[in-house]
Amino acid sequence: AQMDIFEQYFYDLNQFRRVPGNDTVHADMVDMLEEKISMFEFSREIPVIGDTATLSDIGDFYRLSSIVDPETNVSYESISRKEITLFQNSPLANPTARRPVYTMDLPNGRIRLFGRVPDDILVNYIGMPRRVNWTYVVVSGAKALYNANAPDLWHFQLHPSEETELVLKILTLAGFTLKDPNLLQIAAGEDAKNTQQEKQ
């Protein structure tokens, strides 16, 4: 349920960027979605070996925002792998230390740098919410007792405004699991009503 809501942020952001926004501080949908996504924005320095850096060490990696050379504070431009040959063969577009570029191979998370290859790069990215883990201990009578002090305790990470949506998603999933058509119908109806209200 948490991942469904999280991924919907990006689809909604894409949709709302297509329509004119407004200047109202607390009512612009693009601003609200960017605020929700900002909870998951992180930066991390990773080593470069040869001309390649790998994102596989970033366990919660979801989407790449930008790459920066930490020594010069210059941002790398993202280009496709098919464009790199065109860039390298063009005197005006050839990557340089002042205008470096990178290509990304998503399946294996490899980033290849062109123009300038530092020892490390600063990766600005959007991370995934961690999997919820409500810890417990088994007490006498084989009963589970919530353990708030466990080091692996992890709650939902969504924006507080998503509480209703999260409950409805969980109810929908519970309706499927319990095979309760009434519960499923109520949750689906509320979800549709909320979605319609957000789109207006």
Go through the PLM ranges and name each one:
Residues 1-200:
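Glycine-enriched, solvent-exposed interface loops adjoining structured elements
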